[in-house]
Regions:
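Substrate-binding pocket helix/loop in short-chain dehydrogenase/reductase
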Residues: 47-48, 55-60
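Conserved NAD(P)H cofactor-binding loop of Rossmann-fold oxidoreductase domains
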Residues: 40-44
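Residue(s) in the substrate-gating loop at a strand-loop-helix junction
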Residues: 91
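Active-site helix of classical SDR
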Residues: 71, 107
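The beta1-alpha1 cofactor-binding region of Rossmann-like NAD(H)/NADP(H)-dependent oxidoreductases
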Residues: 10-21, 53
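C-terminal helical subdomain
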Residues: 124, 131-132, 147-186
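Active-site loop immediately N-terminal to the catalytic Tyr-X3-Lys motif
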Residues: 49, 98-102
Length: 186
């Protein structure tokens, strides 16, 4: 349906210098970038007062700073063309705190805040910004968890929502997409 070109790179998204170099690599191999999906994320369960030192920093580095640094590299190309769409994959944990999700929720609240500021800053440039806030979605990180796979959403559902948001006219944007499993949050 779409004429899409994708390239793979191996990057530790928690290390800002690697993220910035990744951005440079993308720019040098793709002179025109229409869509950026900031989807790097990590989750370490724990309560704020009981979690190991460094967990907050680890999650903020991956969940927030990777999107921040990559966007700062890629978005200027979009602004130059007055066209583009940035999707930040947040979480329902961006709007609702839950037990044992302390620093993860903090990092995702921050990513949603980043998305809102970015949307405000870019709205007159033709570049759209959409925050995607999914609930529990199946991935390999759920392997071994005592839950039926059917209890989780499928990643394809998130991809379809992103695809649909891309199909809108230039005068319309979806600011936030909240999607949860049919049976509710875990």
């Amino acid at each position: 349906k779409y004429n899409v070109q994708c390239t793979g790179f191996q990057v530790d998204m928690s290390i800002s210098s690697q993220v910035k170099q990744f951005g440079e690599n993308i720019i040098s191999s793709h002179h025109s970038i229409d869509v950026l999906v900031n989807n790097a994320g990590v989750f370490y369960p724990g309560e704020i007062l009981k979690e190991e030192d460094g967990k907050l920093e680890a999650m903020v580095n991956t969940n927030l700073y990777s999107a921040y640094h990559l966007t700062r590299k890629i978005a200027p190309l979009m602004v130059e063309r007055n066209k583009g769409h940035i999707f930040n994959i947040c979480s329902v944990a961006s709007i609702i705190a839950y037990p044992n999700g302390g620093s993860y929720s903090i990092s995702k609240f921050a990513l949603l805040g980043f998305s809102k500021v970015l949307r405000e800053e870019l709205k007159t440039t033709g570049v759209k910004v959409t925050s995607v806030l999914p609930g529990a979605t199946w991935s390999n990180s759920w392997k071994g968890v005592d839950l039926p796979e059917e209890r989780l959403m499928q990643a394809e559902d998130i991809a379809k929502l992103i695809s649909n948001a891309l199909d809108l006219s230039p005068s319309a944007t979806v600011e936030e997409i909240v999607i949860r499993p049919q049976l509710g949050d875990l």
